[in-house]
């Protein structure tokens, strides 16, 4: 059975759970506890989304915040579409995923099955056995979980550069709506822009990257302190807008039909390929000199195991020992965050639940300081500054600066520092 709807703190959304202490407002808030509970209940109900598109202004949707949704191609849902297509490219997980939640809600509203399409190309920069194996192990878990719930999942691993060309368009031809992940870096922005011109149906990109939506502001912050002050002003409202823990419970649990010609031309990845066996990897045109990691496995299961290890062993000493390589104090979660196998919302909720934290502990005013604002133990505040401030500063920059990867995009103080040490 799927897990119950969850607010991100592993707390089932029931009338009783809405009084959980982690959701109690800080003392200075003008809202009462009961009003906050009502807000939380409302956020889990289907609602009317307005202001996104005149063509679907009356579509009832669940509470994926508007600030997380970009309409890349504004069309009404295709009449006669056979399914809703979720094109999984960044948030490669079936839990705590705003994009999957949004796609599942579309499927429910249109009374259509959901088709999850997770591709892996070979032509990306630095493609290697190590990176491929990491992603493939996550795909194995995603396929098994989707099948258990009766949701159609199509894993496609490109055997040669360009072999997957046309597959997205072919799947989208039968889709009422296409939902995908919004991600501001690498080749993904170009890929989404190209898809918006090639597809002939509604295309929406949904941001699951951070606690605060990366496009909630168009201001680019050149310093962590400035961004931290912005976060401290905005975070409280976003802490009540976590993704549903198990969004597939809301999808139509019936198969989505994929045409035979699609399966013949773009066959689903075999068990051998998804297992990332040496033979399977050797047949792919990727860098075989960079072998799979012998100690780090991809996938949500390994991500959650690493998080559990960190909570027990690393977090208590994080503020003192995170920069000491032999201490095992760092979280080690970066690979799974990078490939979308675990969400920042889940990490935050596990950390704060262990700390016994509630929003009542927040400082009444933003300070921009690294310590003291959360009202949490020193080790927790140090970790949150890395997990939220520094990580989401990068998303803010990349989302608002198309030239984020160019030297000229660096703020003057950073360029001055680099130039001063050019001869080091």
Where are these regions (language model features)?
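Low-acidity, Ser/Thr- and Arg-rich intrinsically disordered low-complexity segments
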Residues: 6, 10-17, 23-36, 41-49, ...
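Generic detector of low-complexity/intrinsically disordered segments
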Residues: 11, 15, 20, 25, ...
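Short, intrinsically disordered, charge-balanced linker/junction segments flanking boundaries
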Residues: 421-424
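Glycine/tryptophan-enriched, flexible segments
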Residues: 79-80, 220-413
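Trp/Phe/Arg-rich N-terminal binding region typifying the photolyase-homology
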Residues: 57-247
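Terminal low-complexity, poorly structured segments
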Residues: 5, 9, 14, 19, ...
């Amino acid at each position: 059975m799927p897990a119950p709807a969850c607010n991100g703190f592993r707390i089932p959304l029931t009338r009783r759970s809405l009084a959980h202490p982690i959701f109690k407002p800080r003392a200075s808030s003008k809202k009462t506890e009961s009003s906050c509970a009502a807000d939380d209940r409302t956020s889990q109900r289907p609602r009317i989304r307005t202001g996104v598109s005149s063509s679907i202004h009356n579509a009832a949707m669940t509470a994926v915040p508007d600030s997380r949704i970009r309409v890349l191609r504004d069309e009404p849902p295709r009449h006669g579409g056979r399914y809703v297509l979720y094109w999984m490219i960044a948030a490669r997980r079936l839990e705590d995923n705003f994009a999957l939640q949004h796609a599942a809600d579309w499927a429910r509203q249109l009374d259509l099955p959901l088709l999850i399409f997770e591709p892996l190309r070979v032509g990306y920069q630095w493609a290697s056995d190590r990176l491929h194996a990491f992603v493939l192990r996550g795909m194995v878990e995603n396929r098994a979980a989707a099948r258990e719930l009766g949701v159609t999942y199509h894993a496609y691993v490109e055997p040669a550069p360009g072999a997957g060309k046309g597959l997205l368009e072919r799947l989208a031809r039968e889709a009422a709506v296409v939902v995908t992940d919004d991600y501001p870096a690498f080749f993904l922005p170009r890929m989404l822009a190209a898809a918006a011109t090639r597809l002939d149906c509604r295309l929406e990109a949904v941001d699951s990257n951070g606690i605060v939506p990366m496009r909630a502001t168009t201001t680019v912050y050149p310093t962590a302190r400035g961004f931290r002050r912005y976060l401290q002003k905005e975070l409280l409202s976003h802490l009540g807008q976590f993704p549903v823990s198990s969004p597939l419970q809301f999808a139509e649990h019936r198969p989505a039909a994929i045409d035979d010609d699609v399966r013949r031309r773009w066959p689903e990845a075999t068990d051998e390929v998804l297992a990332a066996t040496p033979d399977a990897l050797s047949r792919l045109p990727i860098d075989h000199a960079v072998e799979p990691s012998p100690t780090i496995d991809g996938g949500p299961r390994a991500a959650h195991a690493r998080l559990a290890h960190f909570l027990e062993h690393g977090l208590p000493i994080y503020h003192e020992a995170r920069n000491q390589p032999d201490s095992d104090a760092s979280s080690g979660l970066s690979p799974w965050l990078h490939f979308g196998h675990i969400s920042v919302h889940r990490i935050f909720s596990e950390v704060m639940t262990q700390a016994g934290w509630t929003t009542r502990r927040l400082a009444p005013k933003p300070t921009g300081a690294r310590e003291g604002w959360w009202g949490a133990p020193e080790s927790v505040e140090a970790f949150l500054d890395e997990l939220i401030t520094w990580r989401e500063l990068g998303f803010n920059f990349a989302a608002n600066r198309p030239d984020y990867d160019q030297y000229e995009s660096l703020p003057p103080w950073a360029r001055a520092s680099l130039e001063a040490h050019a001869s080091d």
